[in-house]
A protein has these predicted regions:
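Glycine-rich flavin
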Residues: 105-186
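Extended, charge-enriched "interface" segments that sit outside catalytic cores
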Residues: 10-12, 16-127
Length: 186
């Protein structure tokens, strides 16, 4: 049978009944804890982070790794399905210029603050290895972030710039908000 006749045959109602799509259901990938399942990351971190910090770093990274496979993934799905949009005017013509975000996007913001994805690099909990710890957390978060890691990178860049070159007003007024773990002020 020529190829064009095969294509026509499969497009007929009889062919669709004989080969229904409901017989082919592919399950999506199951994501597990992004830290405990990434042996290479663990090996690299253990190589560079001193032994006195390693156990605590390992414990601290298991939490965001688990969240990346759970609630953060659900928040990201909502954020992806409902991208931010610009509302220029109210229904009465008043100028608003608001960016409207979905609950998932807002939850990603809150979780980012709670997990300290920016703050951990500035708290210096692990001394000179704090930035490495910070970047590992962001690495674990990124696949479940709906690219929320992009504004986090900009926030981190602004925080570092203010920390190194900002005047006292910026360091007092702005920096604490950029590196806050409190979602209400982050």
């Amino acid at each position: 049978m020529p190829v064009n006749q095969i294509c026509i045959a499969f497009s007929t109602k009889a062919a669709r009944q004989e080969f229904p799509m409901s017989d082919f259901l592919q399950t999506g990938p199951a994501i597990s804890n992004t830290f405990t399942s990434d042996k290479l990351l663990q090996s690299l971190l253990q190589r560079f982070i001193p032994a006195q910090h390693w156990q605590q770093v390992q414990t601290d990274l298991e939490r965001p790794g688990a969240r990346a496979a759970g609630d953060l993934l659900r928040f990201a799905d909502d954020a992806e399905q409902n991208p931010p949009w610009h509302r220029p005017f109210s229904p009465w013509g008043e100028r608003l210029d608001e960016i409207v975000t979905a609950p998932g996007w807002q939850s990603l913001n809150d979780a980012s603050a709670e997990e300290g994805f920016v703050a951990s690099g500035y708290e210096r909990r692990y001394g000179e290895f704090s930035r490495l710890y910070q970047f590992a957390g962001i690495y674990l978060f990124h696949p479940s972030s709906a690219f929320y890691t992009c504004p986090l990178a900009m926030t981190d860049g602004a925080a570092r710039l203010i920390e190194c070159h900002g005047d006292e007003d910026l360091k007092t007024r702005v920096l604490p908000r950029l590196i806050s773990r409190d979602p209400a002020s982050f």
